[in-house]
Amino acid sequence: MAQSVTGIQIGGMSFPPSVKPPGSGNTFFLGGAGVRGMEIQGNFVKFTAIGVYLEDKAVPALAVKWKGKTAEELTESVEFFREIVTGPFEKFTQVTMILPLTGQQYSEKVSENCVAIWKKFGIYTDAEAKAIEKFIEVFKDQTFPPGASILFTQSPDGSLTIGFSKDGCIPEVGNAVIENKLLSESVLESIIGKPGVSPEARKSVATRLSELLKESDHCVAGNGKVDECTKEAEVKA
């Protein structure tokens, strides 16, 4: 896979072109980044800066259907972002504070959003209720000053590794692992899905992946599966 990936600076925060997240032995590339904020009395107030990283094999997997699509087409496609969220590759999301936040504030808001959506679609079960309880417990005693980060590593097998960083460094090991596929996927979808909390991150991911998919070398077999005839990624700082 021929990738030219650069870092992004946004909201005063810097996201490097590649990271090795907690809970994974792989190095991921920066798919995109954006801020989360809202209009308050006529001013756009930024709360967090969010970076979305993907495992290298995301590009050939997505190229089968989406290569050649414009950034605008990808930005507006619900199906494209569902494929990112549910695809057979790892994802890593870094949520860095611009304004201070408590763990309780963060976990309760995420939990409320997830449960409301699950109940709407009739997919909220005892397993999800227990996963939400654990999710809230992990954050209970945490505080996040500006520059601190919440880290989510999402495995396609359904595990969600949660980590924290107060010094800008990415730890090798997470603070907790929750085994619930629905929660794992919902955390990312709540950010880049439609409607997600960061339209800016969604647009950034679509724009960068549109270019990476154009550059990608991939072979599609007759069964529609990808044969990776790819080159090593070229990651530019």
From Swiss-Prot:
The biological pathway it contributes to is: Secondary metabolite biosynthesis; flavonoid biosynthesis
**Keyword set, alphabetical order:** Flavonoid biosynthesis, Isomerase
Q: What is this protein called?
A: Chalcone--flavanone isomerase 1
State the Gene Ontology BP annotations.
flavonoid biosynthetic process
Keyword Amino-acid biosynthesis among UniProt keywords: no
Gene3D superfamilies tied to this protein: 1.10.890.20, 3.50.70.10
User: What EC class is this?
Assistant: isomerase
The root-end lineage is: Eukaryota, Viridiplantae, Streptophyta, Embryophyta, Tracheophyta
Does this UniProt record's set of keywords contain Isomerase? yes
Q: Which molecular-function annotations from GO does this UniProt entry contain? A: chalcone isomerase activity
Provide the gene name from the record: CHI1
Reported EC number(s) for this entry are: 5.5.1.6
